[in-house]
């Protein structure tokens, strides 16, 4: 029978910690981009043409970056779930007798 175990216990625990931090950080960044934080203007991919029609184009770019942050947070959440499954499989492996 094929085993789904592909990570050791330390790597799985590290994956959980990094995923938790990534989810928290990216959700906060997504919220800050969604409220159009002026501090994050350097991270918005705008051109000179975007400044011609008022702030609405810049606001749309802020929201696009915000959605990208939320999507990345979702991917980190999936990675954290995978790492959690690996931790559970490693614990189950400890109790199995060969």
From Swiss-Prot:
Topology relative to the lipid bilayer, per the entry, is: Multi-pass membrane protein
- Give the UniProt keywords, A-Z: Cytoplasmic vesicle, Endocytosis, Endonuclease, Hydrogen ion transport, Hydrolase, Ion transport, Membrane, Nuclease, Transmembrane, Transmembrane helix, Transport
| A single GO molecular function term of this UniProt record | RNA endonuclease activity
Family assignment?
Belongs to the RNase K family.
The name under which this protein is listed is Ribonuclease kappa
What PANTHER family would the database entry show?
Answer: RIBONUCLEASE KAPPA (PTHR31733)
Q: What GO cellular component is one of the record's annotations?
A: endomembrane system
Q: How would you summarize the oligomeric state and partners of this protein?
A: Interacts with the proton translocation complex V0 of the V-ATPase. Interacts with ATP6AP1.
Q: Its encoding gene is what? A: Rnasek
Give the species: Mus musculus (Mouse)
Q: What is its EC number?
A: 3.1.-.-
Q: Name one GO biological process term.
A: endosomal lumen acidification
Signal peptide positions on this chain: none
| Catalytic class of the enzyme | hydrolase
Q: Where in the cell is it found?
A: Endomembrane system; Cytoplasmic vesicle, Clathrin-coated vesicle membrane
Query: Kinase as a keyword?
Result: no
């Amino acid at each position: 029978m094929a085993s789904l175990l592909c990570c050791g216990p330390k790597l799985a625990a590290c994956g959980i910690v990094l995923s938790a931090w990534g989810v928290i950080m990216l959700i906060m960044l997504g919220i800050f981009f969604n409220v159009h934080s002026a501090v994050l203007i350097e991270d918005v991919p705008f051109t000179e043409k975007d400044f011609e029609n008022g702030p609405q184009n810049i606001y749309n770019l802020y929201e696009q970056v915000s959605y990208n942050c939320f999507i990345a947070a979702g991917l980190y959440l999936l990675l954290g779930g995978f790492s959690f499954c690996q931790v559970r499989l490693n614990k189950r492996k400890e109790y199995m007798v060969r």
